[in-house]
């Protein structure tokens, strides 16, 4: 096999030499082989219902008498549509950290546990004196759906994936917990999909009117970004 390969190489070399000699004496047709194409990664488009806006409506400050006043939970639909099957992770970044006041947010997690962890809360706004008035949390409610089938929410905070008990997003101020989805009967690793649908539950709590001055109207201005990363 080694000799045959060497002979073939020598023949090709000799032929190339003859072609060079011929081109020096007379013009010959130039026959060019072109190989074209493009390698492109899958492209995914995320979309939030209602333009990503969550409106908690009007709350009368005189009614905020508890230490942690719970606002009615809200939901948004989050969909990721890809042109080819892709694996992604999700994390969030709080754009209003100065408006965060550590609260106890009731039944915020997937397992209905309360959220009293700063890393899992986002700033909701400040009063006229610059005091933060509360916080909100963002959790994946239930099981995300791929092709009509339920999936498991998995989490990684250091390169190792495991099942998420809370389904909650961290706020990006510390170690980002990456969330993804996995097949319910397969390995605990991110799965590829073309369309992923999930419901996001947004819970919020506001401080009492004795802990924070509320003589003036307070406009909630919470803002956070969902970051999608291809895996």
Ranges and model annotations:
Residues 9-17:
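Sec-dependent signal peptide hydrophobic core
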């Amino acid at each position: 096999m080694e000799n045959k390969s060497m002979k073939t190489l020598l023949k090709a070399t000799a032929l190339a030499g003859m072609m060079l000699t011929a081109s020096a004496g007379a013009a010959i047709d130039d026959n060019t082989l072109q190989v074209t194409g493009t390698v492109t990664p899958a492209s995914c488009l995320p979309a939030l219902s209602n333009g990503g806006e969550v409106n908690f409506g009007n709350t009368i400050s005189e009614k905020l008498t508890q230490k942690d006043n719970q606002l009615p939970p809200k939901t948004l639909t989050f969909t990721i549509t890809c042109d080819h099957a892709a694996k992604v992770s999700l994390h969030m970044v709080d754009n209003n950290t100065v408006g965060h006041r550590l609260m106890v947010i009731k039944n915020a997690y997937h397992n209905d546990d309360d959220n009293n962890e700063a890393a899992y809360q986002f700033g909701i706004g400040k009063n006229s004196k610059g005091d933060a008035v509360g916080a909100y949390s963002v959790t994946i409610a239930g099981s995300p759906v791929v092709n009509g089938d339920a999936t498991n929410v998995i989490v990684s905070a250091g390169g190792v994936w495991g099942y998420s008990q809370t389904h909650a997003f961290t706020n990006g101020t510390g170690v980002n917990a990456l969330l993804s989805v996995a097949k319910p009967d397969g390995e605990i690793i991110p799965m590829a999909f073309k369309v992923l649908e999930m419901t996001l539950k947004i819970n919020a709590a506001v401080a009492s009117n004795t802990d924070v001055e509320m003589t003036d109207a307070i406009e909630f201005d919470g803002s956070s970004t969902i970051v999608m990363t291809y895996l």
